[in-house]
């Protein structure tokens, strides 16, 4: 009798590399920041007033959306008290920034009153004006296979569905002080990531998915301008993933370096607590200056990072000694 050998098929499947929009956006903003954060695992917490205030508004909007979705009365008294108490904490945490004017000419105190007096009612008013819409997603979580190698995961702030046409409207809540420029609305990568998620979540084709930013502090919404967001964005996403695969981590030096958590000038504690996270290629641009691309050290290659960082730290310590 002949022997039959059965070979089991291997079940070892390589897990997908998980990405969020914020992670791929970090690489797009600055490849070296991506390396420090995600490749080298230097996770630093960097609080700022914009993030704290934005998170608070998101929380209130989420509570209102759940009340509407569940056909429950919206307790504005409770929500306003919560908002006021949290704003007081923010004002105590950022006593200068809370009363400084932003590029819209308003302070956070003024934006607080604006939200309390009018913006807080926007979602309820919107739903009353559009009875054909229902809320189908609130902080809607998702995860999907992007290309067989990478997956995207995250959450969508808010999603509506037109009960007549089946169309999905994705809203991302932004507490921007002023609306975005048109150039920023052409095929935003964030919406491409969300549209691919929406297709799988609600079984709706791309041509029946619309995306827009909801701006409660500007009392408006802004729709993405591209007619085919996913097709326009995929080449960009593929190029970003290719850059990561090829370990192209050359820094992008801009005015945004001023707010970066890896900039030792604006986050000096990392010099002592986590020197391996110091970016030696940061821009010396400051709020009162215009030297956007002045840097202490010019980028050479990855092999020079440790030496450049050591030199950068020694120079900064010398500056501190001279000041003291």
Language-model features: locations:
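A residue-level signal for conserved active-site and pocket-lining positions in enzyme catalytic cores
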Residues: 30, 57-58, 158, 211, ...
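Accessory/regulatory regions of helicases
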Residues: 1-10, 258
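Metal-dependent nuclease catalytic regions and adjoining charged, substrate-binding loops involved
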Residues: 77, 181-183, 196-324
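Mg2+/Mn2+-dependent nuclease catalytic core
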Residues: 133-239
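Short helix-capping/linker segments at secondary-structure and domain boundaries
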Residues: 43, 65-74, 130, 201-204, ...
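Nuclease catalytic cores
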Residues: 24-69, 116, 139
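Short amphipathic alpha-helical segments and their helix-coil junctions
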Residues: 11-14, 31-44, 170-176, 238-245
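A non-catalytic, helix-rich entry segment at domain boundaries
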Residues: 60-138
């Amino acid at each position: 009798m002949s022997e039959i050998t059965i070979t089991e098929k291997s079940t070892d499947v390589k897990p997908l590399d998980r990405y969020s929009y914020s992670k791929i956006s970090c690489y797009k903003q600055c490849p070296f920041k991506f390396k420090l954060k995600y490749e080298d695992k230097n996770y630093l917490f960097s609080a700022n007033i914009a993030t704290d205030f934005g998170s608070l508004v998101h929380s209130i909007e989420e509570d209102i959306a759940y009340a509407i979705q569940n056909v429950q009365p919206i307790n504005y008294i409770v929500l306003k008290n919560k908002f006021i108490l949290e704003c007081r904490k923010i004002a105590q945490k950022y006593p200068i920034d809370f009363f400084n004017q932003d590029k819209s000419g308003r302070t956070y105190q003024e934006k607080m009153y604006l939200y309390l007096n009018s913006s807080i009612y926007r979602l309820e008013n919107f739903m009353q004006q559009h009875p054909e819409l229902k809320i189908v997603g609130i902080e809607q979580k998702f995860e999907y296979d992007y290309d067989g190698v990478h997956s995207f995961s995250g959450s969508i702030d808010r999603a509506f569905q037109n009960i007549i046409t089946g169309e999905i409207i994705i809203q991302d809540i932004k507490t921007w002080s002023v609306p975005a420029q048109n150039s920023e609305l052409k095929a935003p990568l964030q919406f491409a990531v969300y549209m691919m998620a929406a297709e799988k979540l609600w079984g709706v084709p791309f041509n029946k998915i619309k995306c827009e930013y909801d701006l409660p502090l500007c009392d408006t919404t802004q729709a993405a301008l591209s007619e085919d967001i996913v097709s326009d964005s995929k080449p960009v996403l593929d190029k970003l993933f290719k850059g990561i695969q090829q370990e192209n981590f050359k820094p992008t030096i801009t005015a945004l370096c001023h707010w970066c958590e890896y900039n030792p000038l604006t986050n000096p504690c990392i010099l002592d607590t986590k020197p391996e996270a110091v970016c030696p290629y940061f821009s010396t641009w400051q709020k009162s200056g215009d030297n956007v691309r002045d840097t202490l050290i010019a980028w050479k290659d990855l092999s020079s990072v440790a030496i450049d960082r050591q030199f950068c730290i020694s120079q900064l310590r010398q500056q501190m000694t001279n000041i003291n």
